[in-house]
Amino acid sequence: DKILVAISGGKDSLCMLHFLKEFQKKALIDFEILAVNVDQKQPGFPTEILPKLFKEWNVPYEIVEQDTYRAVAEKTLPGKSYCSLCSRLRRGTLYDSARNFGCNKIALGHHREDVLETFMMNLFFSGQLGSMTAHYQIQAEGLQVIRPLFSVYEDWIADFVQAQGWPIIACNLCGSQEYLKRREMKELLNQLQE
């Protein structure tokens, strides 16, 4: 297997890359990893951080430049979140990149709370019972998508990454986060867990 590890620069994707790299050293199966960051040309994105980190970690990497930010900004209505369209465009770029770089798997950094929040969003906003899965096939592309952190608590990831002192790139660069429905679901889940 050759796994494209999707790296945003956030805590989840960096934690995932670290553990895949550690697993690679001990695994009884042979696999390659390729860290890929999609540079969507968001204003203020610190482009120097990830290449430096990948070199320090001795991880093969590619930075794929795809100016989706402008398209998302133009097509998103005022008061709405960029996240859904931005995510779809980034995912398409990751699929293309996997093909171009000869990868048969894509690793995404979604964790337990992402799964629960997606379930709640589907329930409240679509009337459907469903969430993301730990892995799935994209038959037409010949790809498998995996989520190695699927059952890992977000707090555990945050604590681990903070203890490592890694540079984290915030996910609020585009300025549309205040309208995020996912934030509402996160707050609801926090209330339910108390």
Q: Which residue stretches match the model-derived regions?
A:
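ATP-dependent adenylation/nucleotidyltransferase module used to activate substrates
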Residues: 1-119, 125, 155-163
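Catalytic subdomain that performs nucleotidyl-dependent activation
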Residues: 106, 113-193
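Short, basic, helix/turn surface patches
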Residues: 86-98, 135-141, 192-194
